[in-house]
A protein has these predicted regions:
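Catalytic Tyr-X3-Lys loop
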Residues: 90, 108-127, 147, 171, ...
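Alpha-helical segment proximal to the catalytic Tyr-Lys
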Residues: 135, 180-184, 241
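C-terminal helical subdomain
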Residues: 191, 211-243, 250-252, 277-281
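Canonical Rossmann dinucleotide-binding motif of NAD(H)/NADP(H)-dependent dehydrogenases/reductases
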Residues: 6-39
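Short C-terminal tail/terminal secondary-structure segment
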Residues: 2-4, 22, 233, 244-281
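Residue(s) in the substrate-gating loop at a strand-loop-helix junction
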Residues: 151
Length: 281
């Protein structure tokens, strides 16, 4: 029965940022394997050929669309593909986003250009895609589910991530507002906030360091793209039919970890001899 609730047969789901070889590509694959027709969106035709075309060759119902979700023309191209696809429009997954290494800097050094680019890449694409899909669902009188990929940087503060974190936090605020506005239309709106995840982009920017991850993350490792995709499928599916306006954090417990913790997740002050002596008094 639970497996049936995860099925998306006959439904169309749009995935933006689908061709980076990480979370978006994995979401595209998993949602297609759940039976959906996926409109896979990316600005890069080369990446679509590399990461999305093989999914279609496996018999999955995946339609690649080269479009920029930040632009009016790009959103229009996506919706044209939706209207030409077989099935009923149902879902959207906003994965497009990210932060260029130049934006990982102290707040005092973040340029106007970088801040604007961060909001365009992470917030505007999410807003305009959600707006278009929600309007289409309302016009058709259909229920649906919209899921956006935020970040733990948008949930808690993160040094050197002021612009990126602000954009992802704004996304969460928008998710809540849209959830309220669309609830009576049967359209649910939620977000997933990944923690450190092993993707091609993360390897490029911060490399692989299992020992660092073991110290920093309570579960001792980075997340896998399929673990983020699983959370997305849950929020798309009927298993979450009474959930809206929420952010599901998938981070291996890193948000639970107080900054003054030792490697074994115990408070550093417990290792202080004077403190231990005071506890015995």
């Amino acid at each position: 029965m639970e497996q049936d609730l995860l099925k998306l047969d006959g439904r169309i789901v749009v995935v933006s940022g689908a061709a980076g070889g990480g979370i978006g590509t994995t979401v595209t694959s998993l949602v297609a394997r759940a039976g959906a027709t996926v409109i896979a969106v990316s600005r890069s035709e080369a990446n679509l050929d590399r990461h999305v075309a093989p999914l279609a060759s496996q018999g999955l119902l995946v339609t690649p669309v080269a479009a920029d979700a930040q632009t009016e023309e790009g959103v229009a191209a996506v919706m044209k593909s939706v209207r030409g696809a077989k099935g009923e429009l149902y879902g959207l997954v906003n994965v497009a986003g990210g932060a260029a290494p130049s934006t990982w800097c102290p707040t005092t050094r973040l340029s106007r250009e970088d801040l604007r680019a961060l909001f365009a890449q992470n917030l505007e694409s999410m807003f305009f895609m959600s707006q278009a899909v929600a309007a289409e669902l309302k016009a058709q009188g259909r229920p649906g589910s919209l899921v956006s990929i935020s970040s733990i940087s948008g949930v808690n503060s993160a040094p050197y991530h002021s612009g990126y974190g602000a954009a992802k936090a704004a996304m969460l605020s928008m998710v809540k507002t849209m959830a309220l506005e669309l609830a009576l239309d049967g359209i649910r709106v939620n977000a997933v906030a990944p923690g450190p995840t092993a993707t091609p982009a993360s390897r490029t920017y911060v490399g692989d360091d299992p020992e660092r991850d073991r110290r920093a993350i309570p579960m001792g490792r980075r997340g896998r793209p399929e673990e983020i995709a699983g959370a997305v499928l849950f929020l798309l599916s009927n298993l979450s039919s009474y959930i809206t306006g929420q952010c599901l954090t998938v981070d291996g417990g890193i948000n639970l970890k107080w900054s003054h913790l030792a490697d074994d997740n115990t408070p550093l002050f417990l290792k202080d001899e004077n403190f231990r002596a005071a506890m015995k008094r």
